[in-house]
Amino acid sequence: MNKNIKYSQNFLTSEKVLNQIIKQLNLKETDTVYEIGTGKGHLTTKLAKISKQVTSIELDSHLFNLSSEKLKLNIRVTLIHQDILQFQFPNKQRYKIVGSIPYHLSTQIIKKVVFESHASDIYLIVEEGFYKRTLDIHRTLGLLLHTQVSIQQLLKLPAECFHPKPKVNSVLIKLTRHTTDVPDKYWKLYTYFVSKWVNREYRQLFTKNQFHQAMKHAKVNNLSTITYEQVLSIFNSYLLFNGRK
């Protein structure tokens, strides 16, 4: 692999695996797709065959030039040479996002596509352990993401599917946007609440009596088995106790 390639990327080259991924994406001929990381253009080419338009964002200069040459005659593909973390997704246009993201930037990128885009569906190839962390409502990331999207695994991708072979397995996941569980006017309060909640700084949020009432109202018997819905209930109690509702 070229030494200048950014973010230590691992590439999917197997036609069989690429086709399996495409089948899971549920894209239509009318769909506009934003792809994170053009890479060598293998997935980009297949995306363009089943969608209306693909805008693919690639930071690495070597890969951008390589894919530009490969895809220059494909009228359905637009390539952009930019860092995805600096890219601005459109506000009004309907679109979906697809991407295989660098493992060590997973948190930054998933926050970017969930909180700074209006994509209805987001398909990401991520490290398997990271996927599990997105579901963990005892972590900040899980509690933030769940307010905007539902997350599900679509496909397991063993390390052998990639070149060079990584040390971990990956999965294809789908994030489906739903109506937000936390209105914009309460978002800053929610992020503050979450920061204290995951660190078990309950006294920063409630008096002893308030905490007992909030837990009772949410029907929480054991904090270790608490659900996302129960955390939301406790947050609503926090708002009420602070005169925000």
Swiss-Prot record:
Which PROSITE patterns would you find in this protein's record?
A: RRNA_A_DIMETH, SAM_RNA_A_N6_MT
- Pfam families according to UniProt: RrnaAD (PF00398)
| Keyword check for Methyltransferase | yes
Q: Which SMART domains match?
A: rADc
UniProt GO cellular component terms: cytosol
EC assignment: the record states 2.1.1.184
**GO BP field:** response to antibiotic
Provide this UniProt record's keywords sorted from A to Z.
Antibiotic resistance, Methyltransferase, RNA-binding, S-adenosyl-L-methionine, Transferase, Transposable element
S-adenosyl-L-methionine: is it a keyword of this entry?
yes
Q: What are the binding positions for S-adenosyl-L-methionine in this chain?
A: N10, L12, G37, E58, D83, S100
Query: What top-level class of enzyme does the UniProt entry assign?
Result: transferase
Name the reaction it catalyses: adenosine(2085) in 23S rRNA + 2 S-adenosyl-L-methionine = N(6)-dimethyladenosine(2085) in 23S rRNA + 2 S-adenosyl-L-homocysteine + 2 H(+)
What GO MF annotations does this protein's record show? 23S rRNA (adenine(2085)-N(6))-dimethyltransferase activity; RNA binding; rRNA (adenine-N6,N6-)-dimethyltransferase activity
What family classification does the UniProt entry report for this protein?
Answer: Belongs to the class I-like SAM-binding methyltransferase superfamily. rRNA adenine N(6)-methyltransferase family.
Q: What is this protein for, i.e. what is its function?
A: This protein produces a dimethylation of the adenine residue at position 2085 in 23S rRNA, resulting in reduced affinity between ribosomes and macrolide-lincosamide-streptogramin B antibiotics.
The entry's protein name is rRNA adenine N-6-methyltransferase
What is the organism field in this record? Streptococcus pneumoniae
